[in-house]
Amino acid sequence: MHTVKLLCVVFSCLCAVAWASSHRQPCHSPPLTSGTMKVVSTGGHDLASGEFSYDSKASKFRFVEDTHANKTSHMDVLIHFEEGTLYEIDSKNESCKKETLQFRKHLMEIPPDATHESEIYMGSPTVIEQGLRVRVWHGKLPELHAHYSLSTTSCGCLPVSGSFYGKKKDLLFSFFGVEPEVDDPQAFVPPAYCEGVSFEEAPDDHSFFDLFHD
């Protein structure tokens, strides 16, 4: 939390300039971020909740679902977006599934063609520490016949919430306790038992959003 406050102080001048701008370019995530991510369907069904780590420079993402969730299996995925590789990891049985990922956009980073929609306060804009200024971005994903929105902090570009509306599913993302750091850099390294595993075929529109379903 102290680190996030420091980021806001450092970038306060930039934020003030951006506030007055009528046309904003998508901001960039910090080099490293981590926290809790929760995904639900628009019907209110809990789909996933767990800890995420994201390396924006290397474009790598790790998500480990909470084991106390009322589910028979728990998601542990590692995605190397630039390489187009998705690992589904089973650490208990030391097994690994590897798939190609042709569609590489996701909600951990604002796509470069996103449109700035608004800048708003969540909570109070006048009471100290009782409000959060966020920027709302939106855009289309024509390859998936879908559109999305993403809210980030005005200072620091940390994820706050997001939504995905497609032909097959609608998803809502929430991010909590986000910090501009990752405790374990090995989170982005596939386990040794993933070495030598052959790629499994996946459709051309296979994406980050396919991970979350009932």
From Swiss-Prot:
Disulfide bonds: none
Compartment list: Secreted
Signal peptide: 1-20
PROSITE patterns: EPENDYMIN_1 (PS00898), EPENDYMIN_2 (PS00899)
Keywords of the record: Calcium, Disulfide bond, Glycoprotein, Secreted, Signal
Subunit structure, interactors included: Forms disulfide-linked dimers.
Cited function: May play a role in neural plasticity. May be involved during axon regeneration.
Keyword check for Transmembrane helix: no
Keyword flag Signal: yes
Protein's GO biological process: cell-matrix adhesion
PANTHER family given in the database record: EPENDYMIN-RELATED (PTHR10697:SF5), MAMMALIAN EPENDYMIN-RELATED PROTEIN 1 (PTHR10697)
Similarity field: Belongs to the ependymin family.
Main localization of the protein described in the UniProt heading: secreted
Glycosylation-annotated residues: 70, 93
GO cellular component terms, A-Z: extracellular region; lysosome
Source organism: Notemigonus crysoleucas (Golden shiner)
Post-translational modification: Binds calcium through the terminal sialic acids.
A molecular function (GO) term: calcium ion binding
Protein name per Swiss-Prot or TrEMBL: Ependymin
Entry-linked InterPro entries: Ependymin, Ependymin_CS
